[in-house]
Amino acid sequence: MLRLILAVALVAACLAFPAAKDGPSPGFQKAFQNFNPNAAAGFGGNGMMGGAGMNPNMFNGAQGFQGFLPQPHQKRDSYQHGGYQHQQSFDNFQGSGGMNNDNSDDSFALRNFNNDGY
């Protein structure tokens, strides 16, 4: 009797949780439908939100979303307007070119995207 109960429980578990080879569930697919696992860098660790490329292909660049940490070549801009007050902005976004804020104000918005390189 115990074996029968265990067998039924095993079959029920297999039906409730499909095998990995069947692919992710529809709910999982919906939640991650915009995530590109083939992105150049993927989820790295260079900055907030994990940094080195949250689907960089979305921004047409190998580096993608670098995070909010200023990069060495950007500090001349990031620190000119009263210190690190742009931490809630996309100042350090780097697509195929880069983000500078030479002409930026203090509003929290995308600033001066330069697609030609920095």
Curated annotation (Swiss-Prot):
Q: Which stretches does UniProt call biased (Polar residues)? A: 85-102
Q: One GO cellular component term, please give it.
A: extracellular region
What GO terms are given for molecular function?
toxin activity
Positions of the UniProt region annotated as Disordered: 63-118
Q: Which UniProt keywords apply?
A: Neurotoxin, Secreted, Signal, Toxin
Query: Where is this gene product found?
Result: Secreted
Where does the signal peptide begin and end? Answer: 1-16
Q: Provide the primary localization.
A: secreted
Q: Does the keyword ATP-binding apply?
A: no
* UniProt entry tagged with the keyword rRNA-binding: no
Using the record for this protein, list the coiled-coil segments as residue ranges, or answer none: none
Tissues and organs where the protein is expressed, per its UniProt entry: Expressed by the venom duct.
Miscellaneous comment text of the record:
The mature peptide contains only 1 cysteine.
Name recorded for this polypeptide? Turripeptide NCR-01
Source organism per entry reads Gemmula speciosa
Tell me the lineage of the source organism: Eukaryota, Metazoa, Spiralia, Lophotrochozoa, Mollusca
